[in-house]
UniProtKB/Swiss-Prot annotation:
Protein name, per record: Aurora kinase A-A
GO terms for cellular component: centrosome; chromosome passenger complex; cytoplasm; kinetochore; nucleus; spindle microtubule; spindle midzone; spindle pole
Catalytic activity: L-seryl-[protein] + ATP = O-phospho-L-seryl-[protein] + ADP + H(+); L-threonyl-[protein] + ATP = O-phospho-L-threonyl-[protein] + ADP + H(+)
Annotated spans, Activation segment: 287-300
Species this chain originates from: Xenopus laevis
Residue numbers binding ATP: 150, 169, 217-220, 281
A Gene Ontology BP annotation from the UniProt entry: peptidyl-serine phosphorylation
Keyword ATP-binding: yes
Modifications made to the protein after synthesis: Phosphorylated. Autophosphorylated on a serine residue.
Catalytic residue list: 263 (proton acceptor)
MF GO annotations: ATP binding; kinesin binding; microtubule binding; protein serine kinase activity; protein serine/threonine kinase activity
Coiled coil residues, start to end: none
Region (Disordered): 1-130
Length: 407
């Protein structure tokens, strides 16, 4: 693989902060879906799957080794109908801010046009951002692997023209089809590419060739928050509150856009160059303008009672996950984690958990207000941001002092 990369891409003097190495993962609770590709926006019927055979566990992910080539996109489109193009926003130019971590929803990269645009057709970015660009692998210099997953790998990359540093996620079509998760990929692209927030990883666009799909992503040099939590065992109140505050602000933005994440967990959170938290995985997210859903998804330890019981759910599932995450930050493990799936389900349904003695009363108050069996009784996100424990512990340090986790 390395030889193929070297032959097709010139080496570059890219300063690399720290690799996003492979670590233990939780397996998401999957839903059986048809392997037939559907156009974006096509409704997918909700299904409830509940059983020990597909519940998540922390395991070592399998390494995949794609052989990258400079093959241009073909007309076999994995995510969209054949009449639509693969267009996306262009990373910033050399005279602009090249640090991906400083991108926010109020400051978007420049874009340029290559060829004609598809009038009246959707693309990977909002139309208001201006002109679009069609990408191919030859537009990038590929660096070292940043991470490995079930369906492909993530590489450090640099856009040749602008010298913009980014992450290139390479997914194999055959594996996506075999697992029946094409709908998740389409959903991730459609949702994440339209979100602009400093605590949400930017998805600039995508392209594909005969066998692979490529996602152009922000580069988060801090790596997975899960790895950082493993290294530290648990976080103190200040660091935990800072992350919960950032995540609450990002979720508040998502909910304002009618987006429910449904799979908040440390493995889906990355750390930017300044140590800021970034939501990175929207594979289980849904855009539900006015509907409630019954689909079982996400990670077992983070599932709320209404989802494991097969009841209707809405954006309040993210409030439950926020409470579970806050507990795991402070304790080092999820509150309902047990040796068996059945016992974990039972404890979630009963909201049965205990606090270690070192967890402060203010932190317990916040977690307890989020982990309510009745979704309507959970503390809303604005209440989270106004909670005394958050206000007391999430104050930013001096401007010249990096946040925890900054590389």
């Amino acid at each position: 693989m390395e030889r193929a990369v070297k032959e097709n891409h010139k080496p570059s003097n890219v300063k690399i902060f720290h690799p996003m190495t492979e670590g233990a993962k939780r397996i998401p609770v999957n839903q059986p879906q048809s392997t037939q590709f559907r156009p974006p926006g096509t409704a997918v019927s909700a299904q409830r799957i509940l059983g020990p055979s597909n519940v998540p566990q922390r395991v070592l992910a399998q390494a995949q080794k794609p052989i990258l080539s400079s093959q241009k996109p073909t007309t076999q489109i994995p995510l969209r109908p054949a009449t639509q193009g693969h267009q996306s926003s262009k990373p910033q130019g050399p005279n602009e801010n090249r640090n991906p971590q400083q991108t926010s929803h109020s400051s978007t990269p420049n874009v340029e046009k290559k060829g004609s645009t598809d009038q009246g057709k959707t693309s990977a970015v909002p139309k208001e951002e201006g002109k679009k660009k069609q990408w191919c692998l030859e537009d990038f210099e590929i660096g070292r692997p940043l991470g490995k997953g079930k369906f492909g790998n993530v590489y450090l990359a640099r856009e040749r023209e602008s010298k913009f540093i980014l992450a290139l996620k390479v997914l194999f079509k055959s594996q996506l089809e075999k697992a029946g998760v094409e709908h998740q990929l389409r959903r991730e692209v459609e949702i994440q590419s339209h979100l602009r927030h400093p605590n949400i990883l930017r998805l600039y666009g995508y392209f594909h060739d005969a066998s692979r799909v490529y996602l152009i992503l922000d580069y988060a040099p801090g790596g997975e928050l899960f790895r950082e939590l493993q290294k530290c065992t648990r976080f103190d109140d200040q660091r935990s509150a800072m992350y919960i505050k950032q995540l609450a602000e990002a979720l508040l933005y998502c909910h304002s856009k009618k987006v429910i994440h449904r799979d908040i967990k440390p493995e889906n959170l990355l750390l930017g160059s300044n140590g800021e938290l970034k939501i990175a995985d929207f594979g289980w997210s849904v855009h539900a303008p006015s509907s409630r859903r019954t689909t079982l998804c996400g990670t077992l330890d983070y599932l709320p009672p209404e989802m494991i019981e097969g009841r209707m759910h809405d954006e309040t599932v993210d409030l439950w996950s926020l409470g579970v995450l806050c507990y795991e930050f402070l304790v080092g493990k999820p509150p309902f984690e047990t040796d068996t799936h059945q016992e974990t389900y039972r404890r979630i349904s009963k909201v049965e958990f205990q606090y270690p003695p070192y967890v402060s009363e203010e932190a317990r108050d916040l977690v307890s207000k989020l982990l309510k069996h009745n979704p309507n009784h959970r503390l809303p996100l604005k209440g989270v941001l106004e909670h005394p424990w958050i206000i007391k512990n999430s104050q930013l340090k001096k401007k010249d002092e990096p946040l925890p986790g900054a590389q």
